[in-house]
Amino acid sequence: LILLIVGGNDTTRNSMSTSVYGSHLFPDQWDKVNANRDLIPNTVAEVIRWQTPLAYMRRTAREDVEMHGKTIKKGDKVAMWYVSGNRDERKFSNPNVLDFERENARNHISFGFGIHRCFGNRLAELQLQILWDEMLKRFSRIEVIGEPRRNISSFVKGYTKMNVIVRD
């Protein structure tokens, strides 16, 4: 339980901020999800794909592996750049665009995969779905004023300051 509460604090909070910032940068997407609330689950997946809250995760190779002509030896440290995978043009068309109708948005790797997949991924998605539902019920628009201040981290992608105006 503690892992769910503490482990997802920064990441879910930063995904919430990214939801606001992304819909500010792509106001047509706010309009789409506002007109069709059934898009909320895909909106959440797309926000998490567009700006994954963690840039990477490091692992240690348990055995020698040959990959794309390179050898990763047992014991080597490997960084999996979620940011890069989620913006891979071979997997996502127009990957730098936030598209709440993206058909393969759930194919992101922001939660990792396999035995190391994020334990709280469904909780995070639920929290973000509730956030979107409540924002759309209460506000006609949320506008970001000025440029948000990003946190200084190569690991966590988020914001330390974001001024907004909330429109009824």
Name what the model sees in each region.
Residues 1-168:
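Cytochrome P450
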